[in-house]
Amino acid sequence: MPTADGKFGVGIVGTGWCAAAHLRAFAGNPYTRVVLMCGRNEQRARRKLKDFGAEVADVSFTRKYDDLLSAKDVDIIAISTPNHLHAEQAIQAAQAGKHFVLEKPTGLDVRELAKIGTAVRRAQVRTIVSFVLHYNPFLKFAYWLRESGRLGAIRYVRCQYLSRILESYPGWSWLKTARSGRSHLLAAGCHAVDALRWCSGLEPTAVSAYHTQFTKGYQWPTSIVVNLQLGRRAIGQVVSSTDYMMPYTFGVELMGDRATLRDDTIFWKDQPIDLDELRQANPFPEVTLKPGRALDGSSMIQIDCEMPASGNVRSHPFQGEIDELVNCIRQNRESHLNVFDAQKTMEVCLAADRSATNNGRTVKLPLIKQTGD
């Protein structure tokens, strides 16, 4: 039930930097107002959220998640707690009739994924999962470029999530554990799996993976390489690691039978891409296209826009995510990033971890044979 001012009431569970990002995004939406937050210690929670840039002076506080579930003025719940709590809290939110935004990973095993899907399907609530890079200008352009047919039929895709995460990372105390962090794909690299699926438009049908560990302090392998079969002919690869001595890197490569997108560059061989035509067709004013030269002197197109260049959530496009969820609620329609789509990404991650644990044995997908959306 909307609040007295006609806005959707929002409840937040979790008090870390993702919760702060959700708070800022809901504050930036004209149809929502955060009314209640849930955490373990009120003074500490308010201080942390303020330090992360969120204004919470007018937001009530509770230590009980049940209070969010039963509150009549809470229509939407934002779940940004440690990973092992996500599934149960999402299921409870759906059963209480609350729409929700859920941080990744949605679930840590097949059973959790299936239970989330069942609860949401029965409740018919609207959901969105925080694969926020869908709202990054570069990834939006990459998706559009492939969808427009300018790359041709996709033959190979590679996405990389490389981020050096150590003790200074917010949430380190639980992220490093096998119970909550679980694996690098589930804790972080699922963003790369999601990007591979979304940007390529292809669904993995089988995976084979290997993992290893170099960085101390983690209770799980810190690097994994995943090889994927994409339909009948295309292949792909995901690399997810916290071991490399380099800045945060989120790489996207889409290689088609006409042209190739490799991060911020478009290449071709036989069929040149007309830069003027591409500029006119480009639907994103924040994306600029420039002529360039490859190392061999051949022509290429340079993409100039905000790239996914930081693991700090303050720079991530949460506003687009929250705006989409609210629009879906207002218009009674599904989000393209609902829990059913996210389930497919999480199944790839679980299959890859299963393969790596079994010395690269191929695992077929999907893991859950019947899904509904």
Locate the predicted segments by residue.
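Predominantly a Rossmann-like dinucleotide-binding segment in NAD(P)-dependent oxidoreductases
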Residues: 133-218, 224-225, 359
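Rossmann-fold dehydrogenase core element
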Residues: 115-133, 152-158
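N-terminal Rossmann-like dinucleotide-binding module
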Residues: 1-54
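Glycine-rich phosphate/pyrophosphate-binding beta-alpha loops
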Residues: 190, 216, 239-247
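C-terminal glycine/acidic-rich active-site capping loop/insertion
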Residues: 132, 253, 257-336, 364, ...
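Hydrophobic residues in well-ordered beta-strands that form the structural core
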Residues: 79, 102-103, 127-129, 238, ...
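C-terminal capping/lid region of NAD(P)-dependent oxidoreductase domains
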Residues: 152-156, 354-373
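Beta-loop-alpha module in the N-terminal Rossmann-like domain of NAD(P)-dependent dehydrogenases
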Residues: 58-119, 317
